[in-house]
């Protein structure tokens, strides 16, 4: 429920499919999120979202349309979301948090000085930043002037991978990121590759038209010194 420039800050829950019961488990987590409106309380469930949709737009009679509308009306309190995630061992093991980094519906749009601390708390809570901006990637890797990886660790819990946002608002934009800024993750096609990217964002996450062709500088041996080894001459 934190306002950005043209909407509210979008926070995404990326759920690991490794647990066979992950769908029922995430439903349990979402059910704990509540929205108070219209002198009532609504839980984040299909039934409650349909009810919310029909109450906020009485012209809607179709359940699918009501679900869609209700989902746009339902606003999650940040402190409540953080509490729900932190209180669940399953959530901490199986959910990665991604936050939009742009101005429209991301943390870059939280510009008021009074909200600076809240913005920092949201970004600290997130594992991943949804942004394809080169400037944002440099920032979250600690490569910008005046901000080191150690500074990021203290203020935000560490460096974070930047990936192109997963939202698509129309069919034409599916698989067609702006300026061909595709997301590349080093690893197998499994959720654990995302976890590894959060641990090593510089080496395992990249945004661009093509993945890096050569090894990263940090993974290249620049010189070798061998002492007391005549056989190496």
Regions found by a protein language model. Name each.
Residues 1-32, 102-233:
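Charged catalytic cores and adjacent phosphate/nucleic-acid-binding surfaces used
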Residues 10-64:
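Active-site gating loops and adjacent loop-to-helix segments of metal-dependent hydrolytic enzymes
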Residues 34-37, 53, 68, 89, ...:
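Generic secondary-structure transition motif, activating predominantly at the C-termini of alpha-helices
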Residues 49-115:
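Hydrophobic, aromatic-enriched interface-forming segments
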